[in-house]
Amino acid sequence: HIRNHFGSKPFKCNKCSYSCVNKSMLNSHLKSHSNVYQYRCADCAYATKY
């Protein structure tokens, strides 16, 4: 929580300039670089990564 106050973002993406305060946010961001769509609608062609 304290990192939010000081602007420290030690978790950095190795594929772009994104950085964040915790590892779970970085893991969520890394999905944006993936071509894997985990969630698909059973009734149509809609799919999303997260």
UniProtKB/Swiss-Prot annotation:
Compartmental location: Nucleus
Protein keywords: Developmental protein, DNA-binding, Gap protein, Metal-binding, Nucleus, Repeat, Zinc, Zinc-finger
Zinc fingers (C2H2-type), renumbered ranges: 1-5, 11-33, 39-50
Superkingdom of origin organism: Eukaryota
GO CC, one annotated term: nucleus
GO BP annotation list: segmentation
Record has Transmembrane as a keyword: no
Disulfide bonding pattern of the chain: none
GO molecular function: DNA binding; zinc ion binding
InterPro entries, per database record: Znf_C2H2_sf, Znf_C2H2_type
Chief localization: nucleus
Keyword Metal-binding: yes
Protein role: Gap class segmentation protein that controls development of head structures.
Family designation: Belongs to the hunchback C2H2-type zinc-finger protein family.
Name this protein carries in UniProt: Protein hunchback
Organism field: Schultesia lampyridiformis
Source organism phylogeny: Eukaryota, Metazoa, Ecdysozoa, Arthropoda, Hexapoda
Gene that specifies this protein: hb
